[in-house]
A protein has these predicted regions:
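Alpha/beta enzyme core
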Residues: 2-7, 11, 19, 31-37, ...
């Protein structure tokens, strides 16, 4: 290691921090609008946008307000959105998830009518929790457990339906074993071999998802999701989940929540060269907004 014991006063690191221009020039990491993905909620059967109480400034959108919101975002330099749909009809199998006239499919078509893929990347969440009457991310057995392999069939059908509607990218979030392999095979068989998959590889069970479940109206009717989402104490498991997603065909891997698992992001960067998405989740957002509203921090 280099000996810096006699570096001062010749070496003064504050020289490169003295003004905003210098700090920007030597920033090791830069986040721009085109690095971000905007999560948007679109709800069937409402006539005007509805603000989500636990997420100030975030709305359940109509198709019309969705398009207008995205127009504003694109004008600001944003290049990508991810869609979460809330249907009017929910049932045990989440039948509206793969319906060609489902709310997500309608939203995709509405956005593709306004924006080309060169202007906007439309990503669709591929899961069942927003669509099932019980709020779990899959098909339940008679014992109330999520049936992994039956659920995979529904994921494939939903992913193909979303791609058919015009989605540019599929994002399976349910944490079922083998979901990337199943969806990749299903998309390829349907002729969508060029559609990338963003895998929720290290998705930890977390109380920080609470406001999202308000927004997507998908809180579990009973139990929790700990049998399929990851245990917060596990890092080696995150490596294994990510490795499996990569060999199954993932194009992007993800860590969720992001802020509490920066060590996991760093760990995954050492093991793979794929893009890593960091999901800043609803609870993280809501904590900032709540602290800002109370004057404890600058919430902006």
């Amino acid at each position: 290691m280099t000996d810096f014991s006699s570096a001062f006063p010749n070496l003064r690191l504050r020289r490169l921090r003295k003004n905003p221009a210098l700090r920007a020039m030597f920033s090791e990491v830069t986040v721009n609008a085109n690095d971000l993905i905007l999560p948007l909620f679109v709800k069937e059967g409402i006539l005007e946008p509805k603000e989500i109480i636990s997420m100030p400034g975030v709305f359940q959108h109509t198709l019309v307000s969705l398009v207008e919101t995205v127009k504003t975002a694109v004008a600001s330099g944003l290049k990508s959105v991810i869609l979460f749909g809330i249907p009017e009809h929910k049932d045990p199998t989440g039948s509206m998830a793969d319906n060609e006239n489902g709310i997500v499919q309608q939203a995709v078509r509405a956005l593709k009518k306004e924006f080309s893929s060169n202007e906007l990347v439309v990503i669709t969440d591929t899961c069942l929790d927003e669509f099932t009457s019980h709020g779990h991310c899959g098909i339940l057995t008679t014992e109330g457990e999520v049936d992994n392999d039956l659920t995979l069939q529904r994921y494939v059908s939903a992913a193909v339906s979303q791609a058919t509607a015009g989605a540019d990218m599929i994002a399976p979030s349910g944490m079922m074993d083998g979901q990337i392999q199943a969806i990749r095979a299903g998309l390829d068989e349907a002729g969508f071999n060029e559609i990338p998959i963003m895998a929720y590889s290290a998705k930890y069970a977390s109380a920080l998802y609470g406001p999202f479940r308000d927004a997507a109206e998908c809180a579990p009717e009973f139990g929790d999701r700990k049998s399929y989402q990851m245990q917060p104490s596990n890092v080696r498991e995150a490596r294994l989940e990510t490795f499996l997603d990569i060999i199954e065909g993932a194009d992007i891997v993800m860590v969720k929540p992001a802020v509490a698992y920066l060590d996991v992001i760093a760990e995954l960067r050492q093991m793979c060269d794929l893009p890593i998405a960091a999901y800043h989740v609803s609870g993280e957002y809501s904590m900032v907004k709540a602290a800002g509203a109370n004057g404890w921090i600058d919430g902006d």
